[in-house]
Swiss-Prot record:
Molecular function in Gene Ontology: phosphatidylinositol-4,5-bisphosphate phospholipase C activity; phospholipase C activity; phosphorylation-dependent protein binding; phosphotyrosine residue binding; protein kinase binding; protein tyrosine kinase binding; scaffold protein binding
Cited SMART domains: C2 (SM00239), PH (SM00233), PLCXc (SM00148), PLCYc (SM00149), SH2 (SM00252), SH3 (SM00326)
Source species: Homo sapiens (Human)
Subunit and interaction comment: Part of a complex composed of EEIG1, TNFRSF11A/RANK, PLCG2, GAB2, TEC and BTK; complex formation increases in the presence of TNFSF11/RANKL. Interacts (via SH2 domain) with CSF1R (tyrosine phosphorylated). Interacts constitutively with THEMIS2.
Protein location: Membrane raft
Protein known as: 1-phosphatidylinositol 4,5-bisphosphate phosphodiesterase gamma-2
Main location class: membrane
Cofactor(s) in the UniProt record: Ca(2+)
UniProt-listed SUPFAM superfamilies: C2 domain (Calcium/lipid-binding domain, CaLB) (SSF49562), EF-hand (SSF47473), PH domain-like (SSF50729), PLC-like phosphodiesterases (SSF51695), SH2 domain (SSF55550), SH3-domain (SSF50044)
Residue numbers of Phosphotyrosine PTMs: 753, 759, 1197, 1217, 1245
Amino acid sequence: MSTTVNVDSLAEYEKSQIKRALELGTVMTVFSFRKSTPERRTVQVIMETRQVAWSKTADKIEGFLDIMEIKEIRPGKNSKDFERAKAVRQKEDCCFTILYGTQFVLSTLSLAADSKEDAVNWLSGLKILHQEAMNASTPTIIESWLRKQIYSVDQTRRNSISLRELKTILPLINFKVSSAKFLKDKFVEIGAHKDELSFEQFHLFYKKLMFEQQKSILDEFKKDSSVFILGNTDRPDASAVYLHDFQRFLIHEQQEHWAQDLNKVRERMTKFIDDTMRETAEPFLFVDEFLTYLFSRENSIWDEKYDAVDMQDMNNPLSHYWISSSHNTYLTGDQLRSESSPEAYIRCLRMGCRCIELDCWDGPDGKPVIYHGWTRTTKIKFDDVVQAIKDHAFVTSSFPVILSIEEHCSVEQQRHMAKAFKEVFGDLLLTKPTEASADQLPSPSQLREKIIIKHKKLGPRGDVDVNMEDKKDEHKQQGELYMWDSIDQKWTRHYCAIADAKLSFSDDIEQTMEEEVPQDIPPTELHFGEKWFHKKVEKRTSAEKLLQEYCMETGGKDGTFLVRESETFPNDYTLSFWRSGRVQHCRIRSTMEGGTLKYYLTDNLTFSSIYALIQHYRETHLRCAEFELRLTDPVPNPNPHESKPWYYDSLSRGEAEDMLMRIPRDGAFLIRKREGSDSYAITFRARGKVKHCRINRDGRHFVLGTSAYFESLVELVSYYEKHSLYRKMRLRYPVTPELLERYNMERDINSLYDVSRMYVDPSEINPSMPQRTVKALYDYKAKRSDELSFCRGALIHNVSKEPGGWWKGDYGTRIQQYFPSNYVEDISTADFEELEKQIIEDNPLGSLCRGILDLNTYNVVKAPQGKNQKSFVFILEPKQQGDPPVEFATDRVEELFEWFQSIREITWKIDTKENNMKYWEKNQSIAIELSDLVVYCKPTSKTKDNLENPDFREIRSFVETKADSIIRQKPVDLLKYNQKGLTRVYPKGQRVDSSNYDPFRLWLCGSQMVALNFQTADKYMQMNHALFSLNGRTGYVLQPESMRTEKYDPMPPESQRKILMTLTVKVLGARHLPKLGRSIACPFVEVEICGAEYDNNKFKTTVVNDNGLSPIWAPTQEKVTFEIYDPNLAFLRFVVYEEDMFSDPNFLAHATYPIKAVKSGFRSVPLKNGYSEDIELASLLVFCEMRPVLESEEELYSSCRQLRRRQEELNNQLFLYDTHQNLRNANRDALVKEFSVNENQLQLYQEKCNKRLREKRVSNSKFYS
């Protein structure tokens, strides 16, 4: 964090004064790029929750941010928020911006104080508070988190919480309350007064809840193998862990060297003691406090020694390091339409990235711009980017930054680039070699705080080394076009691209962004969509019954209300509300004022709509002679769905399926009442298939799945119109008779939207593979006679997915026997995903593609008069009779000409290769001034496939597909080249969604700059973050010395591989998992070894239903042992998924670590979101044990591997005999016999391996005790 104030020099009393001023609050001006006029707000720090809040009035907070999420505090007017209000004069030294968040794109709070003193106080105070928040102990963070929960239901910051409020909070924090009695019993147990908990009681409730849910984990410390034996764990204070027991646990089980110092152990224990009376020379932890310690970040699996920079490792040549590298750094989203921003450069540099990319194009006023050429990504000023790099390059890391320049500028604008580099960077810019006579690259230490330019360089004769093959596909037609939808009779906007004589198009852009477009609803109709509006209620008593039932369930808050149409007076309404334990009614009258209908409760205050009247009295008290009251909770209308076009009261499942099958668009849906029950079903279309999901009633709520609660079906539909219901599908097309009629009229056009033309069903590719086949992820030994035993990699056929986590299947000679579902993965799903990947491999729109037109089958013509209210239209007319024409439109005549010409060249078979060559020839001039700035990173293309005799001053860039080809053919040659020269690898152009490729094999072959899309939250970016967490997050990680030995082979044959380590993992439990959508999480954990292909392996736990707050897998979860060949180049990865109502996994959180940085013992695994940002208090508890494999044991492990491979072959051969009757069965008996012998031998070998691990552990525990 960067400020102009050195807070470390402040005395403690000065820090306290500053914090007190921030707590009292300051009136400041808030700027936002979304608003043209700045606003005055009171900004203050809420110390109890560690949040910055801003408000217009004292009783209503408008917004807040968590201090722990602050990434930067930037002095001055250095954010785009200030740009819209340039007319407002604010002094530079009074302004500052807080950048915060847990996504790649950060949020901003831009403020202007009234004085420089106030601004300095806030800059200093926020830095102090951020340091304190980042260093806070886990118990302190828990207390702050509990305060947030109380304040979330009442902003007055009272010190208590009611039973009704607690019932509301628990589902929001991922815990399902089993019954109302459960909470009431807990209140009695804690000693609550009148259904109200004080904060201290709420804290006690939390501690009891977490302990009771997870106390079985402590059974691990009652075993003989434990280094100390724990006593009774029935209650949180039933027994204790004493000082010397805790020290023994830390030294022998956790292998913490610092624990030799008893004072440090005492200090660690004191942080977790919830009673100052026990903070003595001989402290002890109650068992619930010990359990909290196990889950805490103080007990993290991460070895904190890697947080420091190892300066001894920073003196090798640059080519010996992996260097954190970004692709198209300026982008904040996809490669086609997203925003470019200097903030993306700042974010990457502050994340430790050391190689960033600048895509430079000619801009106005002779100054370049940066954007992704020939796309709709926004343009940013080159000069702004250079200044941002200068300001932030060395904040996180002092080691060199490489600027990879993608050059598209004219010579004149290149000269401006060179000038800007020299003027802005000054001495930071590297302009000459560090050593004139060197024969290798300099080290990171030698290049400290230097900026290196990677750019084409003029040769001795002024020539440029450029390979035309690299550019041949770059100049292609792409952009936005309108397509005429003859079914909906409207133009829809799509992103389109031409490649290989095919036109690919994306989803309708308006539909992908529709939630951002506000609907234009007349003010007089605004109340129609509100849940408090009940239209006509048959009788006054019916309204009273609704209110009474709602208040009985929720606790009866005064002001609970509903609005209904008046039974007696036309245009009037009735307000019914709850006060002092009974229902009262008020008439909302109407009157004409100046020709406009107005509504009122009191004569002196009228409103233009019912909505405005209700909103007013929800914020302001309604005052009458007898009472004063503000409207609070709305009573939802129980049946608003009955008037909706998507609802069917009497429709069978078969009729619903028939209707959906006639509408070939994903997102089509209807809801129907199920026959003979008080439940409903939603029927929808997704991925070309019709699916159903039951909607149950729970009191007044509608429940989708097991824990997604909605007040009404209307609310359910509204929610899933904005959020994904299944995979990425949102509800889009209500199935109505009118929609069915339109589709029946236009059947031919359906083929355009039929994704099956683009994706092939897996069964068509491999029909011999049964649809219900799974692959074993790990060995399993049967514990009962009706269970299967199998080895890792086994294929289990004819699987029946039974409920309860146990499936049935066929393996070898065992037919329809049980096995645990978490030991396998469904290979039909994996095959389908791989198939999708293969089919979109060469598509210019990648995964965004939703349709393809083969231009060779069409003729292109213009529509001179335009069509359907569009002026610039061209039509693809099919050459084959009977196919429908496809109509396109553009906004400008120039765009129409470009698209028409591009398509006509294809349809007329014009070879454009010569034109492309001329285009690039014309654009290859290099400014001498820019060429002179290139010292070490000179790109070479003409000879880059030749990996012999590397020149350390050159760099070779490969697209991922080319790099993959080199690795398959000559991995050792690439490794040896990288020992002296540099390589940079970047994503293929088809990754328009900014997805990433697997970087591991490239790292394995020594590629230094493996450029990824930092803005994308995916597995490979998470692995990248894990790798560069090493060495103090400098962005430079020294490759293992073994990679530079003569005999090292990155892809060794199987005969040369040796297991060097076994890693045993057991997942015990989790806390505070994040919540997706409306449902309470049903989590499971996938544990994976990521590395070379021969190291890759994974394991899944079972699913825990409806508990994301405190799920456990102990004591039933077994330990899993992974065999690792190369621990220096492998990662341990934990991914937490939730299983949704369709049994699909959805990502919740992850934690990925280089195995060398993993600690042994019972360890907390702090969890991160997709962007590798910490999730408050979220963690796993695991047992982890690493053991080197001795030479004498290698033969045993080798025998296991050979037997596993043979068992896979035998199982597949047996399956062929059993499924193909025409095969001769002469050899079947011999196969069965060999299979049985091998299976027994494999189990024997595996038991020997496990026995050795157990013996070592038991002998160790006896020694320690």
